[in-house]
């Protein structure tokens, strides 16, 4: 196969092909596909549910799935909210529909538009009657570029689309990640709480406040705590609950620690692991990374002191929301 005669970008009046431009988009985005931002092209029921759904503004990247289009990417944008009519179901049964963003390219479709300046080359539309478990447009083996935005599951005899019928299928094309780590050393001897969850072996003074990226939707927290002193007091198991915290997000429990009755006292290492949703209100603010514990049964004693180290590792990530 010969090279395209004109690379991107040559001056002097050279004619540039759409294939080379799409190849540039593919290379620049490493072949990624999906929506551009966390809220882009989200499909929602109307504020007052009716027989339509709304597709919010946003942008997306679509791989060229026309025959001969390998290694090319389209970029589309929905500038304003778009409403789509959903066909009502009859009494004979329900139906599953797929809302997609797609490209219609006359170069491959074979029919030139009557007016190329007003033709709608990109559009959002509904594909009716797809398999109930459909998650991507690729599963349908379409012969054109498309990405799945949402699945609508309609019961029989339904003309009104509610939020509970819509499953969000969007994926961010190039999700961002940001990771950081720090080590904390206790400045005093700290016994594990026994009256309820509290920061341990961190304290109010040593919990780090971290800057939350404006694009983050999730944070994963891992804490490795080494050199914790355990003192065996009686011949029964000692159990503790542990959990990670992020801002005001404190789950009931992430895990437990158990020192069996057969264990001897000494220094032990433990790990906290947790995942937290980053809410819209948290983005662009400083939030505290925290780990907590409480002894829930038994009489053994866990103590952090000058021989203890706490390695905190957190990673923000981005996903459609």
Predicted regions: what they are:
Residues 143-147, 157-160, 185-205, 263-269, ...:
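Solvent-exposed, conformationally flexible loop/turn segments
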Residues 32-50, 84-93, 190-216, 230-239, ...:
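Surface-exposed ligand/attachment interfaces on beta-rich extracellular proteins
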Residues 79, 92-94, 214-216, 267, ...:
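Surface-exposed coil/turn segments at beta-strand junctions on protein surfaces, enriched
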């Amino acid at each position: 196969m010969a090279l395209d005669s004109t690379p991107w970008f040559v001056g002097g009046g050279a004619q540039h092909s759409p294939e080379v431009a799409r190849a540039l988009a593919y290379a620049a985005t490493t072949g990624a596909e999906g929506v551009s931002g966390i809220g882009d092209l989200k499909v929602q029921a109307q504020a007052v549910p009716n027989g339509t759904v709304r597709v919010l503004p946003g942008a997306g990247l679509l791989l060229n799935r026309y025959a001969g289009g390998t290694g090319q990417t389209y970029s589309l944008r929905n500038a304003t909210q778009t409403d789509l009519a959903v066909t009502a179901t009859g009494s004979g049964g329900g139906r599953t529909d797929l809302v997609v963003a797609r490209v219609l390219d006359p170069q491959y479709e074979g029919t030139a538009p009557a007016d190329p300046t007003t033709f709608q080359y990109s559009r959002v539309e509904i594909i009716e009657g797809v398999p109930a478990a459909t998650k991507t447009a690729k599963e349908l083996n379409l012969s054109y570029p498309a990405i799945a935005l949402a699945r609508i599951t309609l019961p029989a005899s339904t003309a009104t689309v509610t939020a509970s019928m819509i499953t969000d299928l969007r994926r961010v094309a190039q999700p961002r990640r940001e990771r950081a780590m720090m080590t904390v050393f206790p400045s005093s001897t700290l016994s594990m709480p026994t009256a309820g969850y509290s920061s341990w072996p961190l304290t109010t003074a040593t919990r780090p406040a971290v800057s939350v990226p404006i694009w983050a939707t999730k944070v994963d927290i891992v804490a490795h705590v080494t050199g914790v002193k355990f003192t065996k007091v009686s011949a029964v198991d000692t159990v503790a609950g542990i959990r990670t915290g992020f801002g005001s997000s404190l789950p009931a429990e992430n895990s437990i620690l158990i020192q069996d009755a057969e264990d001897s006292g000494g220094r032990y290492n433990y790990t906290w692991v947790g995942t937290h949703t980053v809410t819209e209100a948290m983005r662009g603010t400083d939030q505290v990374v925290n780990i907590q514990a409480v002894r829930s049964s038994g009489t053994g004693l866990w103590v952090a002191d000058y021989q203890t180290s706490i390695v905190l590792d957190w990673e923000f990530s981005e996903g459609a929301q």
